[in-house]
C-alpha cells in the first residue's frame, strides 16, 4: 500500500501537518476549497522561478493568512518589500478577501522533494539527458543531508517512440514505515515529444515520540545464564 498511496497524505496527523488549516461548515466548505486552489495555482504560476516548496493557507473568522516557503525569497520580496504589496493586492482581487502574506526561506532546498522534481523538469525542458538530470538532483539531496532519495521519470524519454519509466534509488526510502519522515514532490516537463512526469521521494529520518522506546523482543534480549545452586557447608 505504501508504494501506491501519496506518502504525504498517508502520514497526515502522524509526522506531517495539513497545508490548509481551517475549520469549515457545510455552507462555506466548497467555497474555501475553491479559494485555496485558486491561491496555490496563481502563486505557483507567478512565482515559479522563486522555487516554491510549500504554500500554507490558514483562516480565521475574518482573515486569511498565506505562508510561502521559497528557496529564493528575494525574488518574491523585491526592493524594500514592494513586490509583496503588489502580490497581496493581486490575491485580494482574486478572492475578494483581506489577505496577509508571510515569506519564509527554504534553508535546505536540496532536501525538498518538490524543488527537486521541478529541477529535473526544468533540465529536461532544456534538452539535458534525463539520467544526468536525475543524478544531479540525487547528489544535491545527499549533500543536504537526506538519508535516501528515489527519483522516477516517465514518458517518451530521449524522444523514444515508446514511453517507459526509469528510476534511481540512493540510500533507503521506507514507504511502508509510518514514522519515517518522507517528502514527496511531482512535476511535469513539457518537451517537444510530449509531457514527462517526474516523481521524487526523499527520506529525512524517522520520527519517534518523546519518551517512547522501541520494545525489546525476546530474541533481541541477551540470554541470561542460569544461576548455580549454592552448596551448603
Curated annotation (Swiss-Prot):
Quaternary structure, from the entry: Part of the 30S ribosomal subunit. Forms a tight complex with proteins S10 and S14.
Domain annotation KH type-2: ranges: 39-107
Composition-biased stretches (Basic and acidic residues): 213-222
Name of the molecule in the record: Small ribosomal subunit protein uS3
Record organism: Campylobacter lari (strain RM2100 / D67 / ATCC BAA-1060)
Domain of life: Bacteria
GO cellular component: a single term: cytosolic small ribosomal subunit
Keywords for the protein's UniProt record, in alphabetical order: Ribonucleoprotein, Ribosomal protein, RNA-binding, rRNA-binding
UniProt function note: Binds the lower part of the 30S subunit head. Binds mRNA in the 70S ribosome, positioning it for translation.
Compositional bias per record (Basic residues), positions renumbered to this chain: 224-233
Chain segments carrying region Disordered: 211-233
Record-stated family: Belongs to the universal ribosomal protein uS3 family.
One GO MF term: mRNA binding
GO BP annotations, alphabetical order: translation
Amino acid at each position: 500500500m505504501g508504494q501506491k498511496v501519496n506518502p504525504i497524505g498517508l502520514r497526515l496527523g502522524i509526522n506531517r501537518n495539513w497545508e490548509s488549516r481551517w475549520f469549515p461548515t457545510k455552507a462555506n466548505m466548497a467555497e474555501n476549497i475553491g479559494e485555496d486552489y485558486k491561491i496555490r495555482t496563481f502563486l505557483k504560476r507567478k512565482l515559479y522561478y522563486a522555487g516554491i516548496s510549500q504554500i500554507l493557507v490558514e483562516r480565521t473568522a475574518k482573515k486569511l493568512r498565506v505562508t510561502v516557503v521559497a528557496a529564493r525569497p528575494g525574488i518574491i520580496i523585491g526592493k524594500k518589500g514592494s513586490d509583496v504589496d503588489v502580490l497581496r493586492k493581486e490575491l485580494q482581487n482574486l478572492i475578494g478577501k483581506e489577505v496577509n502574506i508571510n515569506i519564509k526561506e527554504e534553508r535546505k532546498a536540496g532536501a525538498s522533494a518538490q524543488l527537486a522534481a521541478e529541477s529535473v523538469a526544468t533540465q529536461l525542458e532544456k534538452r539535458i539527458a534525463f539520467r544526468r538530470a536525475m543524478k544531479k538532483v540525487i547528489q544535491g539531496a545527499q549533500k543536504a543531508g537526506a538519508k535516501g532519495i528515489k527519483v522516477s521519470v516517465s514518458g517518451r524519454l530521449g524522444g523514444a517512440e515508446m514511453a517507459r519509466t526509469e528510476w534511481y534509488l540512493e540510500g533507503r526510502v521506507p514507504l511502508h514505515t509510518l514514522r519515517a519522515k518522507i517528502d514527496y514532490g511531482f512535476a511535469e516537463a513539457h518537451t517537444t515529444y510530449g509531457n514527462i512526469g517526474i516523481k521524487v521521494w526523499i527520506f529525512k529520518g524517522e520520527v519517534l515520540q518523546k519518551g517512547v522506546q522501541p520494545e525489546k523482543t525476546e530474541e533481541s534480549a541477551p540470554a541470561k545464564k542460569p544461576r548455580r545452586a549454592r552448596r551448603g557447608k
